[in-house]
Swiss-Prot record:
Any one cellular-component term (Gene Ontology): cytosol
PROSITE patterns (alphabetical): GALACTOKINASE (PS00106), GHMP_KINASES_ATP (PS00627)
Binding site for Mg(2+): 130, 162
Name this protein carries in UniProt: Galactokinase
Location of this chain's protein in the cell: Cytoplasm
Residues involved in substrate binding: 33-36, 224
Amino acid sequence: MNTSQLREKFKEVFGVEADHTFFSPGRINLIGEHTDYNGGNVLPVAITLGTYGAARKRDDKVLRFFSANFEEKGIIEVPLENLRFEKEHNWTNYPKGVLHFLQEAGHTIDSGMDIYIYGNIPNGSGLSSSSSLELLIGVIVEKLYDIKLERLDLVKIGKQTENDFIGVNSGIMDQFAIGMGADQCAIYLDTNTLKYDLVPLDLKDNVVVIMNTNKRRELADSKYNERRAECETAVSELQEKLDIQTLGELDFLTFDAYSYLIKDENRIKRARHVVLENQRTLQARKALETGDLEGFGRLMNASHVSLEYDYEVTGLELDTLAHTAWEQEGVLGARMTGAGFGGCAIALVNKDKVEDFKKAVGQRYEEVVGYAPSFYIAEVTGGSRVLD
């Protein structure tokens, strides 16, 4: 969607002209899954599937939200003085949370807004539509109210919204990738220290194909919080002998030597995934820096195997996509991405083989699962921004 279309749609809905238009990307994580809330390393990219917005300041204290993705909900009106979580306010709880925490941080938002939203991230796909929306709202408020914010502070407010307003115990990776994204670069982020590097992403004759299971996954209702609790318990058991706060601080030799302290087989598996995935992510960064895409692909495969057998967050749909992808010509690697339990997988595929790949994987998936997957090519882009 371009800026003139955005402005046109805004005027159709609200009857006035928008002040500005905005874009906030989605994200995929190339490798480093379920490590971000364990103090580990991640390697995400911001992508051109994302959330568009048009907005205008109002003279009163009323917030009016409209989403083209939830047209049936119409315009949702919220008084600026009432920024509490309310289930019936549906998707607007995300903007409300961001506004609430911006105010709590001392920023003056002294009037209402009209905000039009259009997203082309498939709902429930695990490509971070909620984080994309959170950062979009942050950028809108920055622009309309002339607030000067460090981008990292906005990223943290997005995470705070997810954790303390919506109630999902997620890490910081999604908001970080979306807020800090850069053209044709992956972000190597240490989630423990928030130190990061931009890693140039030269895929040569290959593209990242996103494979959507089309199985809806509600993060708050999934086993996400359960996995996090298992990891936290494993850390507390290891603390009997080790001075650590997170699993991300461990190398595999140390973990192996002290894993006997963990009193449950499942918790050992969960912790082992995190420790090894952390090492794979470091190796993947090196592979990208040296142009070793075959090595990078093998690490993607190993990541999926670990998520399937040790972390147990894949399921029939994601496994069918990844396993079938591995068998196709021109594929360097494939793995689930995001929280799992549905959502998406990604594959690194030779450009000339993409159509054959989609046909073969799509056919097999439909045979096994009973309905078709969707495919998208991921273009890497910069972070949340003002368009005009």
